[in-house]
């Protein structure tokens, strides 16, 4: 069996107000190829945008890969590497029996992982890490897109 291609992904989410207009950004690197993705929502939260960055990046992969995914969100990293197992056992409820927040996004992220071998990494945000800074800029650009869409819709 051949080895899976290795892809490195950097993600970030941002929100102007929480909730408020938000954006997400992702950088996918495969060998010497690089792809940037971003998007936004008119009314969202920072955690939702952090999740959307990871979901969108993983869903963009066209075949199974080994993925090193870097996020500055402890919420995403801890949620997907730890908390999610208990949530699934408890019918998507927290330890104190409350519904998991952002459950649709967590379920979508869980589904996006199935085809891949993902190693999750945390990187300190706003600490000069070039790819994280670029993902942050893409996320902020996503906020601008969301605001423009809002103006067009009004």
Swiss-Prot record:
Gene: rnhA
Binding positions (Mg(2+) 1): 12, 50, 72
Enzyme class: hydrolase
Subunit composition and interactions: Monomer.
Protein name per the record: Ribonuclease H
Catalytic activity: Endonucleolytic cleavage to 5'-phosphomonoester
UniProt KW keywords: Cytoplasm, Endonuclease, Hydrolase, Magnesium, Metal-binding, Nuclease
Organism per entry: Bradyrhizobium diazoefficiens (strain JCM 10833 / BCRC 13528 / IAM 13628 / NBRC 14792 / USDA 110)
Protein EC: 3.1.26.4
KW Iron-sulfur (keyword) present: no
Domain RNase H type-1 residue range list: 3-144
Keyword Metal-binding included in the entry's annotation: yes
NCBIfam families attached to this UniProt entry: PRK00203.1
InterPro entries, A to Z: RNase_H (IPR050092), RNaseH-like_sf (IPR012337), RNaseH_domain (IPR002156), RNaseH_sf (IPR036397), RNaseHI (IPR022892)
Principal subcellular localization: cytoplasm
Binding residues annotated for Mg(2+) 2, in chain numbering: 12, 136
């Amino acid at each position: 069996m051949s080895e899976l291609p290795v892809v490195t992904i950097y993600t970030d989410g941002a929100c102007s107000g929480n909730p408020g207009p938000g954006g997400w950004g992702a950088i996918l690197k495969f060998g010497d190829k690089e792809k940037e993705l971003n998007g936004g929502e008119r009314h969202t939260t920072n955690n939702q945008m952090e999740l959307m960055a990871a979901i969108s990046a993983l869903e963009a992969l066209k075949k199974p890969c080994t993925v090193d995914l870097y996020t500055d969100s402890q919420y995403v990293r801890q949620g997907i590497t730890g908390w999610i197992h208990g949530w699934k056992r408890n019918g998507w409820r927290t330890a104190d029996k409350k519904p998991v927040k952002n459950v649709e996004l967590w379920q979508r992220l869980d589904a996006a992982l199935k085809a891949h071998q993902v190693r999750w990494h945390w990187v300190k945000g706003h600490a000069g890490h070039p790819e994280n800074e670029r993902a942050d800029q893409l996320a902020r650009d996503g906020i601008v897109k969301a605001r423009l869409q809002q103006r067009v819709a009004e």
